[in-house]
Amino acid sequence: NFSTKKQQKKSFEAHIETSIELQKPLFLHVREAHQTFMEMLKPVKEELPKTVVHCFTGTREELIDCVEMGFYIGITGWICDERRGTHLKDLINLIPLNKIMIETDSPYLAPIPHRGKRNEPYMVNFIAEEIAKIKGLTLEEVAKTTPL
């Protein structure tokens, strides 16, 4: 971290306020700060515009909190990784399909079979296929329902 927690909270608060004021989507990336994240967002839940939790890799409890807040959950190529994505595969059914935001996180987190290569937008298809497989749906059902 290059800034103090106090500075980060102040910046995040300004980000939230601006998003509410302009009613523009709130795009969030949280790591190891879920409790603080929720403490800052819950009081303004009703005012928040559409909100995406980018590249979700948190716990079951954190996911439930985010789903209950009505947030979109960003799923990346991480879910295609047999080693690191296992816990996400176990959680994916907790997310309503229309609240899954399929993301590339380009240029990082390329899905298998492209691990180690530069991630590109066309690779979202691999992520959608993995979600379809886990949820027992067709690729078409996932593509029609998720906000790609």
Located regions from the model:
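Divalent metal-binding pocket/active-site signature
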Residues: 1-69, 82-86, 90, 95, ...
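Aromatic/hydrophobic pocket-lining residues that form π-stacking "cages" and hydrophobic walls in ligand
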Residues: 15, 128-131
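Active-site gating loops and adjacent loop-to-helix segments of metal-dependent hydrolytic enzymes
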Residues: 106, 122-124, 128
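Short histidine/acidic/glycine/proline-rich micro-motifs that form metal-
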Residues: 77-81
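Non-cysteine beta-strand/loop elements that form the S-adenosyl-L-methionine
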Residues: 98-106
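Amphipathic alpha-helix from the class-I
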Residues: 132-136
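Solvent-exposed alpha-helix faces
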Residues: 129, 147-148
